[in-house]
Amino acid sequence: MGPVKLFDTAGLDEASGLGRKKRAKVFADLKECDLVLLVVDPETDDFATENEIVTKARELDKQILVIYNLFRPDAAERIALVEEQVPLLRFHQKIRLVAIDAQCRPALLQFILENFASKNATMELLPFLQRDEFYVLNIPMDAETPPGRYLRPQAMAAEYITRHWAWPVSYRMDLGKARAGGAGERKRFDAFLAGFGKRPKAIITDSQAMDLMHTWTPDDVGLTTFSIMMINYVSRGRLAAFVNGIEAVASLRAGDRVLIAEACNHSRIAEDIGTVQIPNFIRKHWPDVQIDHNFGREFQENEQLQSYKLVIHCGGCMITAQKLLARIRDLESIGVPYTNYGLFLSYMQGPEALRKVLRPWGIDYAAIA
């Protein structure tokens, strides 16, 4: 199977206050997992917990393998009774063993390998990439930029481009000078593009530079953002769903609530995108909209999410695909639209800017809008 992440669920049937917290954690993990190994003791009298887990796992379309843990030889006689109380168990592959017997381990591993079917689709980071072409990474470093390394999306893009026999070229744009209105920074950028033997095939930019890049990028050069690249990659190709959510921006009204969700906990200083730039855009155009934030790898419960008109999510580069897909599933189940940092910042520059950053992905925003 390769490297795996294991979620343990001790205390799932505890009735105490701590037990309730454990249950909440288990059901959060259930949303993110790919495989549920349900260990059942046939000699138990109450199977309400097992019934609840199987029902919820099936609702979430999770694969379930059942392990009957036999503490006594005659415990197997009760399996029919278990499946009368939890009839859904009959629809899943199962094995009988004595978990405390180390000799059962090979049989358990073989059972898992033979029956687990991964649904993880292999995603290409930049599916539009072509061999022997230049690709520009526009990286306007600021006070938040760590020394000695690229950010993860930048490093991933450079590695992917190189691995696929193309040529990544980094460019540092001075946002302050470019926005000051002088011609010097634009001339420097044009000279940079002119220095290639042939046009770069595409530019991948930091989303915060979209106010400049959507007009500076020549029409014959593709354009997208690191945030859009990452959200498509981590969501396993669900970029179009985030594009659909952008329509909720135009319908924001006074009193609406917007959640800005950022999956990491970096130090937020200066002109941070999530806490400064996006909120400033919202307050400028919709001053009476309430803005909340969700930082880190844990997401809000559905009861809280229902109060939001829109969720604007980061690129998701610091969480797993399973965790992001669990967030998407929650939002879709309660009908809350969601979009992405890069899409939002492009949208705020006008329809043509959004069309431009979606073109490399084969998405026609005009058809959606």
Pin down the residues of each PLM region:
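Canonical P-loop GTPase G-domain recognition
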Residues: 62-65, 70-127, 131-136, 143, ...
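Short glycine-rich anion-binding loops that position phosphate/pyrophosphate groups of nucleotides
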Residues: 11-12, 42-43, 141-143, 209, ...
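Conserved C-terminal guanine-recognition region of P-loop GTPase G domains, centered on the G4
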Residues: 1-10, 17-96, 123-128, 149-170, ...
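C-terminal effector/interaction modules appended to NTPase cores
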Residues: 148-369
